[in-house]
Amino acid sequence: GVTTWWTTYVGRVMGQGLGGASTCLLVATGGAIVSYIPVGQMASKIGRKKTIQGGVVLLAACFASAYFLTTHYQSINAVMFVVFALVGLAWAAINVNSLPMVVEMCKGSDIGKFTGYYYTFSMAAQVVTPILAGTLLKHISYSMLFPYAAFFVACSFVTMCFVRHGDCKVEAK
């Protein structure tokens, strides 16, 4: 939802153009790229589940911060770039470890089936949430984008608390 609606949000809520909005998304992507390998290494030390949960907490905090920043400032600023870089880090912590957890839960012959489940539900969420978020933004307020995102990210933390399988064996210290 955030990626889909961000450029419209910046125009409606902040009165800004596409340049700053696009730069924020570029910074988030850069933050993710530089984080992929380190979060994979971190997961081998503390576990995938804890790494994902840390990413989820950071992402929710970033979305809450983005709400505050975008509703209290009329222009994109350096603090927003830092927040978006952290969004990239958080997203990397979640993404790098999610599919490996699914694969760890199944037997070798079931990897394709479980990968199919993973991508089906992941892609379905990516189709549904922009529609749901768009309806909310249209009928309530565009300023609801980040509270909406933070809420559903927090819900994902709750679901991760119930995950019992698929974690890696943590390296000995």
Residue ranges and their predicted role:
Residues 93-107:
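Intracellular juxtamembrane helix-capping segments at the cytosolic ends
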Residues 35-48, 137:
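Helix-to-loop junctions at the C-terminal end of transmembrane segments
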Residues 18-19, 106-118:
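Loop-to-transmembrane helix entry/capping segments in MFS-fold secondary transporters
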Residues 135-153:
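A membrane-interface helix-boundary motif in multi-pass transporters
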Residues 4-21:
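Short amphipathic helix-loop junctions that connect adjacent transmembrane helices
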Residues 58-74:
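C-terminal ends and interior cores of transmembrane alpha-helices
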Residues 45-57:
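Cytoplasmic membrane-interface "Motif A"-like loop-to-helix N-cap segments
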Residues 147-173:
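Multi-pass alpha-helical transporter architecture, strongest
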